[in-house]
């Protein structure tokens, strides 16, 4: 969370030291660019002092701004190098050698989803993915990392957090285990897509009382994704479901990596439900706890974007810089991704 402005070699970097309850606004028009931090309340109140650290220099460009920020994260303990992470995650060096293969098993769209247009389910067996990876090796591919979507029985972005078992129509636990063992034999790495924010009404244990509650007592609801009608699961409860699910998953397969969707990309949530009251800062810590759960089991965690609060745990991300995902493929890019 930092901004920088330069003019003929002079400039500053502004580092948001209290980012939990803040955002920024950008206006970019023919009058120029205007950018500012905006402070938000925390559970309805301005609870603490808000701080932005400005550093002014006469020899400033984006490289220098990045170096100042790097010094800052080392000073404050936000920084942790890959070498340090490799102490607990010994396959990081192997991951660096991999090409990424991103594919899916089952796609299902609920009728109340905004994506629904009458499409049928699409299912690829675990064996077909195993054969695809073997084919890639026969064509000359070396070490691969398989990122697998839609491997749960309900399909991609469906029924979270109650998506188990492994997709029965694709081969079930035996099929997933066979795929994992084949990857291991070929010295490839294997990771699963997972999600603990989108909270679907189709989940067997769905309970609206566990969803994020807004200040007025209402519960946010939409049907933007394939799984249809949903709320947001309060992050204070996410570690419970992570532990429950992976206690079962790890009975069947060994894992090298796990991708916890949206955690490092979407904004922090706050929850006004008195049974699990949560600030945005606490939300951040609960999400970190989910990453740490993986680390404690030797599983490399990843998520959607490179956010500094998560860098002590995250090893890699899938959509950094995320901004390019929000525009047409050939649209003009905005600024320099640093």
Where are these regions (language model features)?
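Carbohydrate-recognition beta-sandwich/jelly-roll modules
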Residues: 1-145, 151, 158, 168-170, ...
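Glycan-recognition surfaces
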Residues: 8, 199-240, 292-338
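Alpha-helix boundary/N-cap detector
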Residues: 57-60, 64, 237, 282-285
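Aromatic-lined carbohydrate-binding/catalytic grooves of carbohydrate-active enzymes
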Residues: 90-243, 251-258, 264-276
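Alpha-helix-loop-beta-strand connector modules within alpha/beta enzyme cores
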Residues: 179, 284-294
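Catalytic metal-binding/acid-base residues of hydrolase active sites
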Residues: 263-264, 307
